[in-house]
Amino acid sequence: MKVCRIVTAGATALAASAIVGTVPPAVQASSASTATWTKQHPATSPPAREDAAMAYDAATGTAVLFGGSGDLDDTWTWNGATWTQQHPATSPPARQAAAMAYDAATGTVVLFGGFGSSSLLGDTWTWNGTTWTQQHPATSPRARQGTAMAYDAVTGAVVLFGGFNSRTSPNYLGDTWTWDGTTWTKQQPAAHPSARDVAAVADAATGTVVLFGGGSPDGGVFGDTWTWG
């Protein structure tokens, strides 16, 4: 797995297949003119993969990586210089294309869904820096992959939007859910993005979740921008 970092006024941000959730303020505030990519050469790295889930864990100051292609269920953390494989007693089942975001209200990283060994998943897990805990909310979003998920600082909840489920009709989803640390709640906004599988990031500067683009049901791609919050 290739690892790079963006160097911005003394702060670094990790880059891999996807990063979602809260990003350190120093990275958010940096300008493109001062940022550079620097390839890292850690002594140990996770095995090569794609479609891993990754988010910044502000409680521990590390980036957390889980799973990916190849039926992987390993957990790794990156502290800015070193990859460390974690060995929790319990872990989520192997999966790829899961959603992950840091929940600042609870100080945990939230993982949802993805594609498992043979089917789509709709389970919810939280990581507290040392332990994975499966959550068992009474209601959950349906199983999916390619979901957009990010933390909304205004409401103190993790926001989930859309994704792809090959076994439902329609396959592309356009629903909005929020996670408050114990409960998933389906939202019914008057206006919302059209169904898609997308990426989303939290914008702490404005207190909104920003969503851009994604794949459309007709095989094309979107180039629109939406905000939530």
Where are the regions a protein language model picked out?
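Kelch-like beta-propeller repeat domains
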Residues: 3-7, 27-229
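C-terminal segment of classical bacterial N-terminal signal peptides
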Residues: 17-26
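Sec-dependent N-terminal signal peptides
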Residues: 5-15
